[in-house]
Design a protein with these regions (language model features):
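N-terminal signal-anchor transmembrane alpha helix
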Residues: 2-29
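Membrane-interface helix-boundary motifs at transmembrane edges
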Residues: 3-7, 72-82, 130-137
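Membrane-interface helix termini and inter-helical loops of multi-pass transporters
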Residues: 32-46, 160
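Membrane-interface loop-to-helix entry segments
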Residues: 48-63, 106-118
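Helix-adjacent hinge/juxtasegments
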Residues: 62-99
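Hydrophobic alpha-helical segments of small multi-pass membrane proteins
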Residues: 85-94, 111-125, 143-147
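Membrane-helix boundary connector in multi-pass membrane proteins
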Residues: 102-108, 124-137
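Juxtamembrane boundary at the C-terminal end of a transmembrane helix
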Residues: 151-161
């Protein structure tokens, strides 16, 4: 394998790893509440079973990492790449904060406010990524769709409780 392939492979693994790390940090706050607080609160009829969320989020974090890699490999010397990846890191932080607020603090209302910021951060990431790599932007489509659904669930849980 030549140097460039090794370098790109390391970037891909790093980008996915950083993205998954955000999910792991969020899960530290999520897991203790899934079988206690979250199991007891009222949820909307279309709320998926708890076991669905782990595989969905693991997949979405991997897709985020692939998208970030497609942007990163264009080169950090480019201003648009730096901006796009900075926005990306910001949305990862918002993503992690949602788990802390919703599951850690048991605050559906606070999490509802936060998920609005997350949604706009994802939209900003998609726009910034599209300027660098259209495929990277499209790879994030399932993510913003899922967060839109999660926002509906969050709102419903807030109303029901």
């Amino acid at each position: 394998m030549n140097r460039m392939k090794i370098h790109n492979t390391l970037k891909l693994v790093s980008a996915i790893g950083i993205s998954e790390l955000a999910g792991i940090i969020g899960s530290v706050f999520t897991m203790p509440s899934v079988t206690s607080w979250y199991a007891e609160i009222a949820k909307p009829v279309i709320n998926p079973p708890a076991w669905v969320f782990g595989p969905v989020w693991t997949t979405l974090f991997a897709l985020m990492g692939v998208a970030a890699f497609l942007v990163w490999r264009k080169g950090l010397k480019r201003r648009d790449v730096k901006i796009a990846l900075s926005i990306f890191i910001g949305q990862l932080i918002f993503n992690t904060l949602w788990s802390i607020i919703f599951f850690g603090l048991h605050s559906p209302g606070g999490a509802l406010v936060e998920i609005v910021f997350l949604w706009f951060a994802i939209a900003a990431t998609i726009i910034a990524f599209a300027k660098v790599s259209k495929p990277a932007a499209w790879i994030l489509a399932p993510y913003i769709l899922w967060v839109s659904f999660a926002a509906y669930l969050n709102y419903s849980i807030w109303i029901l409780n």
